A protein has these predicted regions:
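Rossmann-fold dinucleotide-binding core
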Residues: 24-94, 98, 102
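C-terminal regulatory/interaction module of P-loop NTP-utilizing enzymes
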Residues: 83, 109, 114-122
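Rossmann-like NAD(P)-binding element
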Residues: 1-24
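Structural/interface elements that position substrates and couple domains in central-metabolism enzymes
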Residues: 101, 105-106, 111
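N-terminal alpha-helical segment
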Residues: 8, 57-58, 108-109, 140
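Short, small-residue-enriched loops and turns at beta-alpha junctions
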Residues: 2-5, 98-99, 148
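NAD(P)-dependent Rossmann-like dehydrogenase/reductase catalytic/cofactor-binding core
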Residues: 87-93, 118, 123-227
C-alpha cells in the first residue's frame, strides 16, 4: 500500500480481523507512525513497523518501530525472526516520523539542496564529497563512533570538548540542539558502549584495514560505473 494513513489503516484493520491473535502484523512503511496505522486493528500489542532498506536482498538492516501499544513480547519475537533470516534488526525505542535512517538521509538531502541552490557545488561534487570522504567510513561505522575516534585517546569526551562549540557555527541550515550536560553524557556513554572496551587506536587500525580493502573493491566496480 502507498504511504497513506487512510489506506493503510483500512488495510491493517482487515488484516487484523483475519490474522491469528498471536501473529505479528508489520508494515514496511517508510515513515508513518504505527500507532496511527494500527489505530483500528485488533490486538494492537502485536503490531509494529518493519522498515527495510533497498535493495532488500542486499541490505541486511531493518528498522523495527513499535507503536504506543506494542508489547515487548512481540518486539522480541520480531527481533528473533529477522535474525533467523540473516537480517540485522535495529530496534527503535519509540515511534517517530521517518524513523531513523530516513531522517538522517533527509537532513543530508535538504542540506545538499541548499548548497546546490546557492551555487556552492554541483550534484556530482556533492556526491563525490560523500563517496570519497565520510561515506567510506560510514559503510563500516556510523557518525558517532567515527567522532569518538576523532577525540583521540580520550574519545568522545575530548571530541565534544574540542569540537562541541562548532555546533554554534553557521555550517548548516539546520538548527543544532543545545549541547547540554545531559546530551553530552548520553553521547559519551553511547560511544563508549559501541567501542566494546577497544581503545581508539585498536578501532582506528580496524577501520584503516577496512578502508584499504574497500578502496580496492571500489576501484574494481567504480570503473564499470563511470564508463
Amino acid at each position: 500500500a502507498t504511504e497513506n494513513y487512510s489506506l493503510k489503516t483500512k488495510l491493517m484493520n482487515i488484516i487484523g480481523k483475519y490474522a491469528k491473535k498471536n501473529a505479528i502484523i508489520s508494515s514496511s512503511s517508510s515513515g508513518l507512525l504505527p500507532t496511527r496505522i494500527y489505530s483500528k486493528c485488533k490486538n494492537p500489542e502485536r503490531t509494529m513497523i518493519g522498515h527495510p532498506f533497498n535493495p532488500v536482498y542486499m541490505c541486511p538492516g531493518v528498522e523495527v518501530v513499535p507503536g504506543k501499544k506494542t508489547s515487548k513480547k512481540y518486539l522480541n519475537k520480531a527481533n528473533k525472526f529477522y535474525k533467523s533470516i540473516s537480517m540485522n534488526p535495529i530496534m527503535v525505542q519509540k515511534e517517530l516520523p521517518g524513523y531513523l535512517s530516513d531522517r538522517l538521509q533527509e537532513a543530508l538531502w535538504r542540506e545538499g539542496l541548499h548548497i546546490i541552490n546557492e551555487g556552492y557545488a554541483t550534484t556530482e561534487e556533492l556526491d563525490r564529497a560523500i563517496e570519497d570522504g565520510p561515506g567510506m567510513r560510514w559503510s563500516l561505522m556510523g557518525t558517532f563512533l567515527t567522532f569518538h575516534l576523532a577525540g583521540g585517546k580520550a574519545g568522545m569526551k575530548h571530541m565534544l570538548e574540542q569540537f562541541g562549540p562548532a555546533l554554534k557555527l553557521p555550517w548548516t541550515k539546520l538548527k543544532a540542539p543545545k549541547l547540554s550536560k545531559k546530551l553530552s553524557s548520553r553521547v559519551i556513554a553511547g560511544t563508549k558502549k559501541q567501542a566494546k572496551g577497544k581503545s581508539v587506536t585498536m578501532i582506528s587500525n580496524i577501520r584503516d584495514q577496512y578502508l584499504v580493502e574497500l578502496q580496492k573493491l571500489r576501484k574494481k566496480y567504480e570503473n564499470k560505473l563511470r564508463k
